């Protein structure tokens, strides 16, 4: 079953966003590699695995400036600090 956003506003980037396509390919490969085994908590696992490198790379890009990184991510600085602590990145 193919899932396509029914409303244009659901899609923030172009329909063939390179990042979105890359993520889709990785998820398809992961599901294929499960080889019939159940994946528990896949949603949270994918979010965590995407969020950690996103936070690290944005912080590197902002030369460690958490205020700039939070602004670039579109989140409050307190939220960024909470996530960094949660993932053991501080």
Swiss-Prot record:
Task: Give GO terms: molecular function aspect only.
Answer: sequence-specific DNA binding
InterPro entries under this entry?
A: Fis_DNA-bd, Homeodomain-like_sf, HTH_Fis, Trans_regulatory_Fis
**Similarity section:** Belongs to the transcriptional regulatory Fis family.
Note the PANTHER family from the entry.
Answer: DNA-BINDING PROTEIN FIS
The protein's matches in Gene3D superfamilies, at most eight in alphabetical order, are given as: Homeodomain-like
Keywords tagged on the record: DNA-binding
Listed GO biological process terms: regulation of DNA-templated transcription
**Protein's name in the database:** Putative Fis-like DNA-binding protein
- DNA-binding region location: 66-85
């Amino acid at each position: 079953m193919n899932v396509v956003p029914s409303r244009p506003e659901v899609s923030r980037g172009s329909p063939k966003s390179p990042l979105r396509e890359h993520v889709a390919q990785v998820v398809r490969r992961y599901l294929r590699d499960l080889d019939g085994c159940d994946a528990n908590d896949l949603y949270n696992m994918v979010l965590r695995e995407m969020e950690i490198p996103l936070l690290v790379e944005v912080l590197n890009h902002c030369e460690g400036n958490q205020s700039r990184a939070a602004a670039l991510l579109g989140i409050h600085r307190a939220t960024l600090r909470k996530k960094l602590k949660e993932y053991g990145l501080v």
